[in-house]
């Protein structure tokens, strides 16, 4: 979703780059878990500590939401903005689902994956 070809290309390349980073990290952790059964516990504790340290960050700031909405809307009409808003909501849901799936692949239970995903800082970090 982009208002012009350059932004569309940049967005696609950034998404591909992020997917590679996540795939590498998950593959590395998955292999590490095989050799260190306590790693999942330490990762769990790390997520909780990070959440506690950053708990003042309660969500995406409005400027980020507005920018994402405008980029995905592709226009200024009420209909386009509504579509953009729906797409941003779907993006956030898809990111949660993706985090949960990656955590399941690492060996966390469904409940642990849901809890850890919920603790994720809601600012795309």
Task: Describe each region flagged by the PLM.
Residues 1, 15, 23-24, 35, ...:
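Aromatic-enriched hydrophobic runs in primary sequence
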Residues 11-25, 29, 50, 54:
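Alpha-helical transition-metal enzyme core signature, strongest for iron centers
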